[in-house]
Amino acid sequence: RKEDLEVVKRLQEEFAAELAALRGRVEALEVRTATLEKQQFSTTTKLSGLVWFNRSTATSFDKNVQFEGIPFDGRTPSAAPGAGNFVRNAGRDAVTGRPIVLRVDEAQSTFSYLTWLTFNTSFTGRDNLVTQLAAGNGISPINEFASAGFFNSFGSPFTDQSAGPQNGSPAVVIHDLFYSFPLSDKVTVTVGPRVNWYRHFDFNRYTFFLTGASSFDSIGATQSNAIDRGSGAVIEWNISPKLRFAAAYLGENTEFLPSAVPGFNTSSDPRFGLFGGTYTATAELTFSPSNAFNLRLMYNYSRLQAVGGQVGGATGEPFPYGQLDAGPGFSVFTPGNNFPSDGGLQFASAHFLGVNFDWAISKGFGIFGRYGYGDVNLEPIDRKVNVQSFQAGLGFPDLFKKGALAVVTFLMPMDITRGRRFFAAGAGDGGTMYELEASYYFPVNDNIALVPAFYAIFNANNFDSNPNIYVFNMRTQFSF
């Protein structure tokens, strides 16, 4: 009404000064709000943790299992059945030039732990500085049956491990240390002195170690990469919702390898450096036409630095297990010595091609698989070693409970197609090892899970004449 408008006009005139002051405060508040929205994030660090208990048993039912290698304590082969020696060196007989073969028929059950504490620090809200600490005391009993260069491989639960270079010692180590930031809306860069390669490559929904397959051999491609952690950078490009590309260069720097030994942790060793020791260059293309299907194609180039004239073991991929040397006449074992003579190699260069897929056919059933092929050239002798591997499996999500996952997988971790004579350990008697695994992830609640697992190992250490080995593991998993 007209009289109401006149009242409003009179009030505006009477309180003009107050309204002007209020308008100024609102404008100032809007400026401050815009500034806060632009710079809203203060440095924040969040702590998360994972703790595992492992109760593990490995048995051949008292049948002798052959393995290649010499005991770490240097005892003569005839006096060393393998008991108590968890890290073995590869050596050849001085007369025949053949790898030394020993036997063991039992391993004691173990109860161990592993813990990871992760600090995630962000400065802008979009970046992430990751510092992960680890400590554990696990030595899986299956290692008692393993040849040199096979430590923590077949039948060994991934979380049944020690974190540092001293097996069984609960030393605290830096597991991961890297910084990730967006270069654009579609490109992310990760850089650091200890980048975890497996955070960026070779993922599979049914073999992720926290909820899926659970052994060292089954959680990823056995041949894919010689570096677990390394110094360098990773670039990830989400080209489209259906296509992703990732590439990396990493110089080896792994928490469980002893830096005091020349040839390990080469990226921080001035004798080798970031580009002169063990390093890898990786490229992976992921095609995801739907949420149910993923196909990954990978290429990896590796330079493998020799240690004691041998290459292999923890930094041997794409030949995942065993130790290579220059052939008979090298790596000669003398009773009473901890180490064999020089293996005759300086380094090896290697190429790996791999394919990896997972397909959720329905809500309660899926299939997955991997295939890999590796070509290794030994220097300075200029000789070739070729190795292939495969994995095939079934996944049963939400079996008996929402969030649960049962996995059955069959795999061939290493089939030597060329160059057996250059294996100082790992080639066995010409056989090929196979593994069968069944595991079941059962979430008790949001923070606790039980994961029973069973592994059967056929032709262990690539000996056709070896008996089967069976592993039973019960994992209790805590997350916070």
Label each residue range with its predicted role.
Residues 109-113, 171-175, 227-231, 277-281, ...:
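Residues that define the transmembrane beta-barrel architecture of outer-membrane proteins
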Residues 63-100, 141-164, 207, 213-214, ...:
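Solvent-exposed loop segments that connect transmembrane elements
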Residues 394, 468-480:
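Outer-membrane beta-barrel "beta-signal"
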Residues 1-106:
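N-terminal periplasmic/intermembrane-space "pro-region" immediately following the signal or transit peptide
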